[in-house]
Amino acid sequence: MPGSLRKMPVWLPIVILLVAMASIQGGASLAKSLFPLVGAPGVTALRLALGTLILIAFFKPWRLRFAKEQRLPLLFYGVSLGGMNYLFYLSIQTVPLGIAVALEFTGPLAVALFSSRRPVDFVWVVLAVLGLWFLLPLGQDVSHVDLTGCALALGAGACWAIYILSGQRAGAEHGPATVAIGSLIAALIFVPIGALQAGEALWHWSVIPLGLAVAILSTALPYSLEMIALTRLPTRTFGTLMSMEPALAAVSGMIFLGETLTPIQLLALGAIIAASMGSTLTVRKESKIKELDIN
């Protein structure tokens, strides 16, 4: 990784991660608008195909050399990246965006919990859990939530956890350029699946520009930024900071879909933001991960 990335201030990866999450939320809103045209698998195919082309053109990954011990994590990174996209888009066909994001977040939350070493880290995880608990419709509306969609969102969360863990080891040497190889692996698996299910509509001229925008907002930009953050932040800090995702999804729904938030939901968002801020304020520069400890 270039020396400039290695010497970046401790707060900069946090800002980079927040920008990546905001980009993903914008891309998710746009992607859902394409579902009536090509379906969730088709949007996944567009996102990965076009996003991979952008990443390959920018990073020129054929010049990279990966050590033998990095190849298996790289494979897991690519497969989990594709699985996370595919399962999440399938889930939001039948589950509201905010609920799907909250359920998907169980993956990075588990990473934060199991990577915790200090009592103060556990406090931030508990705050994030409380926020997620009150964001989910656990009262009368839960019976109206599609269980299959919820299961798909949880599956996306599991892929997200693998993405975090494998991404740190796979990207330790080449940083954000690694995402181009990971995206290529994901595309080789999931683009054919999506193309078969979407049919000829996938490549219609009116769909391609929107698909390109989704690819930039949801793949090329955020995953490149996340790879920088992954290799510069402790596992627990990265996982807890991702608690901003459900909050951003809820705010996005309020702005673009006209959804209103109850006082309890506002408190839940406050708890999640507090967890993210607490994790940020207690991050220690010397604790940045150089090699992932999986024990």
Curated annotation (Swiss-Prot):
Organism, scientific name: Escherichia coli (strain K12)
Q: Where is this protein localized, as stated in its record?
A: Cell inner membrane
> TM segments?
10-30, 39-59, 72-92, 94-114, 119-139, 147-167, 176-196, 201-221, 238-258, 263-283
Its taxonomic path starts at: Bacteria, Pseudomonadati, Pseudomonadota, Gammaproteobacteria, Enterobacterales
What function is annotated for this protein?
A: Involved in the efflux of threonine and homoserine. Can also export other amino acids such as proline, serine, histidine and cysteine.
Keyword vocabulary terms for this entry: Amino-acid transport, Cell inner membrane, Cell membrane, Membrane, Repeat, Transmembrane, Transmembrane helix, Transport
Q: Does the keyword Transmembrane apply?
A: yes
What GO biological process terms does the UniProt entry carry, in alphabetical order? homoserine transport; threonine transport
Could you tell me which residue ranges are on the Cytoplasmic side of the membrane? Answer: 1-9, 60-71, 115-118, 168-175, 222-237, 284-295
Every copy of the EamA domain together lies at: 30-135, 159-278
GO MF term list: homoserine transmembrane transporter activity; secondary active transmembrane transporter activity; threonine efflux transmembrane transporter activity
Predominant location category: membrane
Provide the protein name.
Threonine/homoserine exporter RhtA
